[in-house]
Amino acid sequence: MNRILRLLLCTLLLPAMLTSCASAETRALFINVRKADAALIEVNGLRFLVDTGHKDSLEQLQQVLETYGVSRVDGIFITHTDKDHVGGLKKLLKSGFEADMLYAPALHSEKSNAKHPVYEASEKYGVPMTWLSSGDVIPAGEGAAFTVLGPLRKDPGKENNNSLVMHLVTPDGSLLLTGDMELPEEADLLAAGLIPRADVLKVPNHGEDDATGRQFALTVQPKWAIISTNTIDEPDTPDEKVLRNLTQARASIAVTQDADVGILVILDKGKLDVQAINWE
């Protein structure tokens, strides 16, 4: 843990953050939902959620969304069916939260599409759904889009390796979003030449030792790497080898557990600012 840059560029109280971010064109808040994933992304006035944490951390996610005044998003991406990524989805929609579209990877380990939790949520709450495959592009306003990189093949035994991997490119900068991708999916994407450089990396699989290989980190060369985890839930995260690989790639590192609300990334015309956001 001593390799992590704990003194981020700025630590703010939430109300001040809302004011200070008003001019930013692209921002991503990686929310502290313990050892789970949930990120709120805003680009060109459009808002997206990437994962919804687990049901036990839904209250924190809802509190953050309410504080932002976010009652609807243009899309919710669920990277895979692990409960710490999709667990909050159904209760979030049941609460009246609105989404224009739900997205999930077409390759998954559920017995059928009808058994997929995102499909079930789509049917129950009347939200349209799109299955995503490598090569698909989801526009996000002028000059911006999410490009789906993986998964390239179905891993029937390890749902993490069916994780939706996306590259968000905007005029302000880029983010690589990786779900819980482990080393086998990393290897597939590296072999296919699909791993891009990115300004910001959402570190795969909570910084565990079965992901973020050295070649992957050196290929992405992120300026900042964001790890979504909690050492109470998972004491071995972030793994020292993962931190070493990211450090060798010259990435600064932030961990969601080090902020009450989460880690805010602001991309603004090539400039990059990272802030730890706390409640009052």
Question: What is the predicted function of each stretch?
Answer:
Residues L8-M17:
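Bacterial N-terminal signal peptides
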Residues N2-I4, C21-E280:
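Non-globular, low-confidence helical/coil segments that flank catalytic cores
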